[in-house]
Amino acid sequence: MCSLITQLCDAGQLADYVGLGWLNAVSSQPYLVQALGLQPPPRRVDVDAAFRDAKGLHGHQPWVATPLPGQTVRALFIGINYYGTSAALSGCCNDVKQMLATLQKKGLPINEAVILVDEDNFPGRTDQPTRDNIVRYMAWLVKDAKPGDVLFFHYSGHGTQCKSRGDSDEKYDQCIAPVDFQKSGCIVDDDIHKLLFSRLPEKVRLTAVFDCCHSGSIMDLPFTYVCSGGEQASGTPHMKRIREGNDVLGDVMMISGCADEQTSADVKNTATFGTGSTGAGGAATQCITCMLMNNQSLSYGKLLIETRDMLKRKGFKQVPQLSASKAIDLDQTFSLTEMFSVDRSIQ
């Protein structure tokens, strides 16, 4: 199956990500995430240079679907297994396959996709997930975005922390680790925020999924989901402002695999989640894709609660987080394309 899909991509045809996602990784080995530990603060990202580099970049159409009239749908997928290093993982590229399969199955009409993975022969792969490539393709994702456009971002790999470079709210910055992080350094949350949001206009919808350790606030968004009585309690859920000065014009929602202080677990056999996939993969990705595929009318609040409940039933201690650029009305039906209804009582 995998070799056939690779041949189709090489011939310029479209990949069947649904088939690949549902039958992938039958020979994958189980893996456990080894925490990277505190990393040295990396050099700052030159945001202006990143956008200059992004001008000539293009993605590819991964599948055919009914388009959204007058709207562009663009997506960036990053999966890193760190092959041949002391940081090696086994399921992050599978997570990308699973997410692609889910979005194809749901019919999201992506006009342009970029896939940065370190797995050889990955169908539709754009390039390696180096620090430079991740930075410039983050800029590519949002460049020239206009009101009504829809963007999607998925990262599966190592997440870690470094001492804060001056964020007044946090002692540590959260980071993602590119495939070459040992040589080139990580990418911190401050720079992720600047790359994705500093030039994002109003009425652009962006959904992000981070399946990595220490990812709770990795986009530095101003609002987060809270529940009275604790994260796993049954109290009244609502959005709460946790940051000042980081407001974002677009409608951005992020689901992260765990809180800032937690690690994000991985599963030996994703078939136990009932998503149709097999082999190694991220627990949060598997739960989120299962929720998206099996529940057509979940609210934003229910999407998070049921993802948390599914992980808890499977014996995982991590608590996925939901954060956003606005105080989302948590009773609104979840959508990858629609603008938010906002709870005006929360400032």
UniProtKB/Swiss-Prot annotation:
Result when mutating residue 211 to A: Loss of autoprocessing and catalytic activity towards substrates
Residues of the propeptide: 1-55
UniProt-recorded Gene Ontology molecular function terms: cysteine-type endopeptidase activity; cysteine-type peptidase activity; metal ion binding
Domain of life from the UniProt record: Eukaryota
Site, as annotated: Cleavage: 55-56, 268
Annotated spans, Regulates substrate access to the active site: 1-70
Full protein name: Metacaspase-2
